[in-house]
Design a protein with these regions (language model features):
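Long, well-ordered alpha-helical scaffolding segments within enzyme catalytic domains
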Residues: 135-139
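N-terminal accessory segment detector
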Residues: 1-109, 116-134, 144-168, 173
Length: 173
């Protein structure tokens, strides 16, 4: 049973599509900014390993909630890789990062040639952070909310990756 949260959505009633899109871009951008500052300030106040561990905890929980909500809101009934990909296309980070999703008969491959998080760190003179465990938890939580049979395999992820690709993931049933 989902409890509805009271929100005043009346501002959207008079918005045309371009204005709604502009606002959606604003929300997505600030979603990413909050996530980034949260991580940076935890690392600054404590240390990088603590920030990474806390990030892993957050990202092993939030995607499960998102997947369940997306299934409900968008009436996604498919299971397996089809249902996973359909829900994943609505997922906030798919939109923010621009996951390249390759669907094959027995597997799905997600590639990330341009990772906004790692690229921002490099621009600021910071090293890439170890994100494999965090993303494994994220993808497993999301995938298992769609179908617990889905297996997640990291092909590679920062800091160990080829120069033209930050990470690549394989999903199978």
């Amino acid at each position: 049973m989902r409890l509805e949260v009271a929100m005043d959505l009346s501002i959207f009633e008079k918005m045309e599509a371009p204005e709604l899109r502009n606002y959606l871009e604003f929300l997505l951008w600030h979603y990413r900014v909050i996530d980034a500052f949260w991580f940076l300030y935890v690392a600054e106040r404590f240390d990088q390993p603590t920030a990474e561990r806390l990030n892993e905890k957050v990202w092993s929980r939030a995607p499960q909630m998102a997947a369940k909500d997306l299934v409900d809101r968008f009436k996604i009934e498919e299971k397996g890789l089809k249902g996973f990909v359909r829900a994943l296309r609505y997922f906030t980070w798919t939109i923010l990062v621009g996951y390249e999703i390759e669907e094959k008969p027995d597997e799905v491959i997600i590639s990330v040639p341009d990772c906004p998080t790692q690229m921002a760190r490099l621009r600021r003179g910071l090293q890439e952070f170890f994100c494999r465990d965090m993303h494994k938890g994220e993808f497993e939580a999301f995938a298992h909310a769609i179908d617990p049979r889905i297996k997640v395999e990291c092909i590679f992820a920062p800091p160990e990756h080829p120069p033209d690709m930050f990470c690549k993931w394989r999903f199978t049933v």
